[in-house]
């Protein structure tokens, strides 16, 4: 995924009200920007650290700029715009980054399950169906362990139940961790944050739901999922 034009460097002041952040531009001007992330962004929000913004160039938008990348306490980059995760995963699947998911037609946001959900990506090959749910990982612990979720996720638990449901119907079901953190080397459930999700994730794996984690390279010009990581349950 290319950023055209490249992202704009700034300094993060604070993140608040879930969807807002204050930053200081290179000119010294302090502005409020959109922060498209519903999670806690734990270990990602470091006051006075470098960050990167995209420019909508849309004068009708209340907040012209969007927070895209932040610098963590360890100096890594984390991609906090969760709205980009689905497109990154679709791009990676089409590029063959995960061989197990190659050779399918791809549709977005299709209805599925028994709880009124929409799957992020539906892969089709003849009569075969593969349901792919995408989750963005930005929480990292010392040593490179990536954790999900970074806050209690009722919605995430619902999606795991839906994946188990379609797997029981004979379809492939996939949970895809989109790792937008350059310091993450493996992914695990964040049991200390959401024990229910961790338990459900292990149940889902035992029921045949496939789990993949792929780490992105991140920069002001491009984000790209490149490297498969181990998932430790």
Swiss-Prot record:
Single annotated GO MF: DNA binding
Highest taxon above the source species: Bacteria
Pfam families given in the database record: SfsA, SfsA_N
InterPro entries, per database record: SfsA, SfsA_C, SfsA_N
Family: Belongs to the SfsA family.
Protein name: Sugar fermentation stimulation protein homolog
């Amino acid at each position: 995924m290319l950023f055209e034009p490249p992202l704009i460097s700034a300094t993060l002041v604070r993140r608040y009200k879930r969807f807002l952040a204050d930053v200081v531009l290179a000119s010294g001007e302090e502005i409020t920007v959109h922060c498209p992330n519903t999670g806690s962004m734990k270990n990602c929000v470091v006051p006075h650290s470098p960050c990167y913004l995209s420019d909508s160039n849309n004068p009708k938008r209340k907040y012209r700029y969007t927070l895209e990348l932040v610098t963590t306490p360890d100096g890594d980059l984390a991609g906090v715009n969760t709205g980009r995760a689905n497109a990154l995963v679709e791009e990676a699947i089409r590029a063959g980054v995960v061989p197990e998911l190659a050779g399918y037609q791809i549709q977005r946001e299709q209805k599925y399950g028994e709880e009124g959900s929409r799957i992020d990506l539906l892969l089709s090959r003849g009569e075969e169906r593969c349901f792919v749910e995408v989750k963005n990982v930005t929480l990292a612990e010392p040593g490179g362990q990536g954790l999900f979720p970074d806050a209690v996720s009722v919605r995430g638990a619902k999606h795991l139940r839906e994946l188990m449901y379609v797997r029981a119907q004979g379809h492939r079901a996939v949970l895809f961790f989109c790792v937008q953190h350059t310091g993450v080397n493996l992914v695990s459930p964040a049991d200390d944050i959401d024990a229910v999700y961790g338990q459900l994730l292990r149940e889902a794996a035992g029921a045949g739901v496939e789990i993949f984690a792929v780490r992105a390279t991140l920069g002001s010009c491009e984000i790209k999922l490149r490297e498969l990581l181990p998932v430790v349950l």
